[in-house]
Every structure is written in structure tokens, then in C-alpha cells.
């Protein structure tokens, strides 16, 4: 069964976004990737259930924790993982590393994250990107397959 899942992930990677799509998404991402706190804030603001999944933030006022070192550190980890995957995209030799990162994510999040929460995270990320980057139909058509690949790879490990 594990082999089948791995084979499907590799097949998804091979059928993933084109080089041009990856390049356009990376260029867009590079303009906001250092806004880690703002990105996580936007995700939590739109999805309080995701915030409550993190015990250190559950039940706390989002605006009051946004500027704290704990929030900043956690935003760095969450958005940092996405940035690492974005950096690895575009080189087929990096596929095993991407899959390993997804597997690590799955191990650490299996008990507290759901595919639905990842879908909501993705939607909130897109809303953030639309407001914080130059977003047009070309950028959107580049991001869609990149996000499909990244989030399906992560969800496969939950």
C-alpha cells in the first residue's frame, strides 16, 4: 500500500506544473515569502478552526498574539515549509526531497490536521496572494497547478 501511495505521488509530481508555471508562481511567491506573520495571520483570521488546532494559540485573541515571538516563530515554520517546497519545485531531482518533507509533515500533523483544513489553508493563502501580489489571470493560471501539486502531496500524507 505504501508503495502504491509513493507511486501515485511520483506520478503526480511528473504530471505536475510546467516549468513556466512554476517560474511564474515562484516569482509571485518571492514578493511575499518574507511576510510569514501576515500570511499565517490571514489564514488564522479566515479559519479560526485552524488556529485552535495549535494549542499555544487556541482560545487566544488573534490580534493580541500576532506580534508575539511565539507567533512569529510558528509562522516561520508554517510558511517556511511552503517556501522550502516552492524553492525545490522545478527540478525533478528534488522530487524525493519534496516527498520526504510531505511525509514529515504528515507524521507531525496526522492527529491534528485534516484535508479540509489544508483546503481552507490553501483558499486563504490564495486570498492573501491576490491582495498582496500582482495577481492577474496569467498568475492565477500559474498558481493553480502549483498549489494542486503542493497541497495534494501534503494531503496524501495525512
UniProtKB/Swiss-Prot annotation:
It comes from the Eukaryota. One of its GO terms (cellular component) is extracellular region. GO terms for molecular function: heme binding; metal ion binding; oxygen binding; oxygen carrier activity. It holds the Pfam family Globin. InterPro entries: Erythrocruorin (IPR002336), Globin (IPR000971), Globin-like_sf (IPR009050), Globin/Proto (IPR012292), Mb-like_M (IPR044399). Residues 16-158 form the Globin domain. Belongs to the globin family. Residues 1-15 form the signal peptide. Monomer. It comes from Chironomus thummi thummi (Midge). This is Globin CTT-I/CTT-IA. PROSITE patterns: GLOBIN (PS01033). The keyword Heme applies. The gene is CTT-1. Heme b binds at residues 74, 109. Keywords: Heme, Iron, Metal-binding, Oxygen transport, Signal, Transport. There are at least 12 different components in Midge globin.
Amino acid at each position: 500500500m505504501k508503495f502504491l501511495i509513493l507511486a501515485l505521488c511520483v506520478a503526480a509530481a511528473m504530471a505536475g506544473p510546467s516549468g513556466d508555471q512554476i517560474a511564474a508562481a515562484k516569482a509571485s511567491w518571492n514578493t511575499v515569502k518574507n511576510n510569514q506573520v501576515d500570511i499565517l495571520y490571514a489564514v488564522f483570521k479566515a479559519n479560526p478552526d485552524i488556529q485552535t488546532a495549535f494549542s499555544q494559540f487556541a482560545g487566544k485573541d488573534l490580534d493580541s498574539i500576532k506580534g508575539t515571538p511565539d507567533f512569529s516563530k510558528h509562522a516561520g515554520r508554517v510558511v517556511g515549509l511552503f517556501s522550502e517546497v516552492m524553492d525545490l519545485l522545478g527540478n525533478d531531482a528534488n522530487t524525493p526531497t519534496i516527498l520526504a518533507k510531505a511525509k514529515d509533515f504528515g507524521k507531525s500533523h496526522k492527529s491534528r490536521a485534516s484535508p479540509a483544513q489544508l483546503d481552507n489553508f490553501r483558499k486563504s493563502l490564495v486570498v492573501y496572494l491576490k491582495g498582496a501580489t500582482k495577481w492577474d489571470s496569467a498568475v492565477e493560471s500559474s498558481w493553480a497547478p502549483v498549489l494542486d501539486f503542493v497541497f495534494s502531496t501534503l494531503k496524501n500524507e495525512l
